[in-house]
């Protein structure tokens, strides 16, 4: 195939799609250029599914090559290693809108690889990667119901910005990524500076309208490339098996879905499934039916049973109304030795969240393609297998945990103090101890409580809620505070976090087309009502940050010195600062602008270190009397230390009003004496006098 190129303007940027020249053995390959940011995105699909495959094995890997930014990796091996958190998050960003566009019965393995090969520091690789994945999938000749478009939206001074640069995002009140087909929004990921629901919805609509040009260009590219439609045909539905299944099940699935306890409901459904398999075992062999097919159809009946009951009765699995939030209990200060903690329970979802305060040096150094930077607000989310009553792998966080942690972090970021206002590194850890839906939003609520318990001056409490949707034709219901089953069997997962004033984070994943603006507006308004209710429950336990930090948290004292005096504080080979930290047990950070931060759990120790630094950096005043220690005896006088790092000479003639034959007769090293500063010359040499002090005292 000859090289094909398509170019279009997208916001301020020029986007080019190229295919037919590079990676020609992949099913689909596209080079995407957005100004100087260049990615190669490839798609390879297996010709057949593996025997017994019962899920769709789609993998997405996004990688930023260090050479893209003209850098060599800083690791020992000097090559790219395992995926960074950013790479994992962008991989998920690509995956989420394309996964629903494959047929349910398609089980062939599909792998998407997006490599950033040139990176303009002002243009991130996420949107080009999503566009490239959509184009490569469309060229691959597989049953993909795309293409999709993707756009990043900023908001400033009442105006939406299409695909803002990195610099523009720093000033923006919003960073929102939206992806979808020509007719439907499929995915939204965002963080916001407490914006209204209307502004958030407007950004989604604006982004979906603008991305249409991406979809049109990809359609044009695939048409010119002559991509043939996929010849994959879904397996025919086994009507006889479905009828037999319904006869054996009867009303037992419906009865099981009326059980309100999650584990009891799960056990009841499993018992029905086991009984069905046992009863139909003979017919499976006689009719030549497949067990995997039976299990698939059983899952389909689960799906239909729950959804039909919801639409018909407007009553949830656990007996709640559509808008009701599960019972909430809140506790703070649940762990005695940590800096801040909260226990947040909502129904059968529970999180213990802990806040730890550290100094600036505790921040995480990120070695990125564009250079190193330090992150001083860390949020870690852990989802152990026991939280859902299962055995499983424990330890290294999976992609889902990284994604949920980032969403929860976005939820509270808008209310966090700046490093200037609160110069601590803050680490929040959410331990999910029970889960039945919306654990990431429980993490938002728990983190708000833990931060306030730690005394972090957040601007306002934050809460989060997960919304769901069940839609059949024109009938639909929007669900507040969804359960795990409602998430799994529903059509939308819509998470909203914010304060009483506005939205701080919004994440949306939609599995079907036909979600209208009105449905999204209803979901946002219903989420606001739920969020305000949750905030009210949280306020009963703790409504504002504590006035004092934990006894076990480090206290920070900040002083400012002239940058020229930094070398005096550090001392020769670091001797002075090492002596201060060793003597006082404090941790001291010195910044280039002369800002010094002293950290210690002991307030008195911090004040002592501050006093010593002030002494070192203070100027010696002629005419002032100091108390000093004799540092060295010489034939012509004695050197006395009057301030740390500042020695002056008491000449033999200035030791006493009497004649002194030998300095050692009057002074010894280590003696503490009072001296008056006679002069500080141009070279900084200090002349001292003991005699002048005695004369001054005698005259009083």
Swiss-Prot record:
Entry EC no(s): 2.7.7.8
One Gene Ontology cellular component annotation held by this UniProt entry: cytosol
Binding-site residues, Mg(2+): 487, 493
GO MF annotations, alphabetized: 3'-5'-RNA exonuclease activity; magnesium ion binding; polyribonucleotide nucleotidyltransferase activity; RNA binding
Coiled-coil blocks: none
Domain named KH: residues: 554-613
Domain S1 motif: start-end pairs: 623-691
Main location: cytoplasm
Subcellular location(s) per record: Cytoplasm
Homology family: Belongs to the polyribonucleotide nucleotidyltransferase family.
NCBIfam families hit by this protein: polynuc_phos, PRK11824.1
Complex and partners: Component of the RNA degradosome, which is a multiprotein complex involved in RNA processing and mRNA degradation.
Protein name: Polyribonucleotide nucleotidyltransferase
Gene: pnp
